[in-house]
């Protein structure tokens, strides 16, 4: 069986550090900070770690329906989504992820845009 990106990068331990780095950037963003005001960052970091792990071949799965339900009433704009993707990419680069891996993760995030953006 081929090794997944999840396994190759060190699993949840590494991905959790990336998620923490992302959430350290959130308060400085003009586009996304307001979506996370009064949020439980501990829980968000855990969920983002699991979600990113799922994209990378880890054991947890998030369906498009799950994503849609989670973000249903957040009214996330395309500009905010784009900012999230850029901050996420920066966080992966901060931990020296390879360009091809970051490109793959970016593509997977962009593929899920319609399940995350807008009001439902």
PLM region spans:
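Core of compact, soluble alpha-helical bundle domains
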Residues: 1-120
């Amino acid at each position: 069986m081929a090794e997944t990106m999840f396994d190759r990068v060190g699993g949840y331990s590494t991905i959790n550090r990336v998620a923490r780095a992302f959430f350290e950037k959130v308060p400085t963003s003009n586009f996304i900070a307001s979506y996370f005001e009064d949020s439980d960052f501990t829980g968000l970091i855990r969920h983002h770690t699991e979600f990113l792990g799922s994209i990378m071949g880890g054991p947890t799965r998030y369906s498009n329906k799950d994503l849609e339900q989670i973000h249903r009433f957040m009214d996330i704009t395309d500009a905010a989504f784009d900012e999230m993707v850029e901050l996420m990419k920066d966080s992966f680069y901060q931990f020296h992820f390879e360009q091809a891996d970051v490109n793959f993760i970016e593509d997977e995030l962009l593929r899920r845009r319609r399940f995350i953006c807008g009001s439902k």
